[in-house]
């Protein structure tokens, strides 16, 4: 095996089942095994095992997560494990997204409406930039990575190399920058823009916030290249040569654009004849007006709103061909880790059908050309065709993963902490609420927390209200609560602002809370998705990070799913306790800071600034400067927007020190939001 470019930084050695699992997975990869499963119980260190495998194999890796929040958590963990390598984050960059749609029954057209998170867009560009420039790359992504992205061939083809002494006029460079969708803005200098001052051109690349490039010209030659602070103009480093990557993934050179526009006109003519032949004159007029407006903008600007709907023509694909996506940016030998595979695999399979249904209506009624159907996520078989070697990671792998891997399973049942699976108990449903209330009071008195899962939203609300009336502080989670607020509620539970969290689906992200010593499942004998054997095992795992962990199921009969879940938990528990006895291990509850992984950055920034101040007073002022104003993620987002306005105003007034302070604060607040799972 060649030397790995990854440097794993950790104070821990693999323990429990980790050494055997790591060795087995690495051996299988080296032997060419294409699919295998890592079955790891909650708290067994699956992320650490993945990192060890990546470091030993030395290949670029994609870690696929079922949602943005879990992706953010994994991103933070991998950044800490690989601080010297490229760990990047690739999720949907929309803070808000209302897709274009048409409802024929009410003749209602819903225009696309969205809000793009600039920080996430930067991270997406950083991800593709890393993949095209180095091999020591780990990309943590949500399933949005299977959606269409610009062709990597065109993206790489349109990079702009610059170096000192190069014969290149400023006008020629400006023309090329505009072609790859950079905008000139001499007043509001931000990511994806450039400005000109005399013989100096400055640009902030699409994959940077904090650094800009300064290119100085002497006549038609490049005289010097520097990296600078975009706010203060301070030179950070001299650069002999560099490469500027496009500001958009949907870029095309002029020749290709001319060909694409011609192809779009041909398709439009063909579709109009078809619609008029069917006497659908309204649809024909609508389609012609909308498409001609887009073509006019593409001819003038090189792009248009919704340009992704023409991606088939821009990429030169045939009808029905799959789009390029993030997977196409990886080299052929990459590794894929599908985290929480029992959820993620089915998500990948479902993406195409939902997208197709919505767009078919738009095409049928003249809002889009048929080629818009090819701006889509990958179909499941297309996704599989792009894989090289995959590891499916879950505490409860599904039948598909087990069949796909032909029984090649590495088990992590033993936790490095010595913690064992919780004891499970079944009690009758009669009087279940008051019985549970008593259990909650016991846990609250011991400074422990409780998770309760119900069948309906109404029951969750009623139970929460009743517990609060009876003096037990409780809150509930439901589908109306967005990701950021959800993380805030979970942090509040850990801080003991309340003791009982009630919800319908406690299988979602962010609920591995070491303070939880009791998980209660009401109406456990009502069969369904959330009461299947796999779901029950996942729910049991929420109590597996506390040495006092218990599971209470309220049911009048023991269903097949309940029995299977209890049997599997008993099997794991027996093996875990046996290992502990043999190795003289005494389990202890995990101690974990309540703060997000980014909170240490606040402390470091405050301390550094405090050293420049006057003793304790300087440190106190620094802490006030760098601490977030609010723990509410919505408020944090508003604060960031206000601070960005203040920063630009300060820079305009030449108050560079003030602007730099605001810049640092914005960066920390953005990372705080990302650590809380709210980054887009």
From Swiss-Prot:
Gene Ontology annotations for the cellular component aspect, listed alphabetically: cytoplasm; excinuclease repair complex
Domain of life, source organism: Bacteria
SMART domains tied to this protein: DEXDc (SM00487), HELICc (SM00490)
Localization: Cytoplasm
Motif Beta-hairpin, residue numbers: 93-116
Zinc-finger among keywords: no
Role noted for this protein: The UvrABC repair system catalyzes the recognition and processing of DNA lesions. A damage recognition complex composed of 2 UvrA and 2 UvrB subunits scans DNA for abnormalities. Upon binding of the UvrA(2)B(2) complex to a putative damaged site, the DNA wraps around one UvrB monomer. DNA wrap is dependent on ATP binding by UvrB and probably causes local melting of the DNA helix, facilitating insertion of UvrB beta-hairpin between the DNA strands. Then UvrB probes one DNA strand for the presence of a lesion.
Domain-related comment: The beta-hairpin motif is involved in DNA binding.
Similarity annotation: Belongs to the UvrB family.
Assembly notes: Forms a heterotetramer with UvrA during the search for lesions. Interacts with UvrC in an incision complex.
Protein name (record): UvrABC system protein B
Organism: Nitratidesulfovibrio vulgaris (strain DSM 19637 / Miyazaki F) (Desulfovibrio vulgaris)
Origin organism lineage: Bacteria, Pseudomonadati, Thermodesulfobacteriota, Desulfovibrionia, Desulfovibrionales
Gene: uvrB
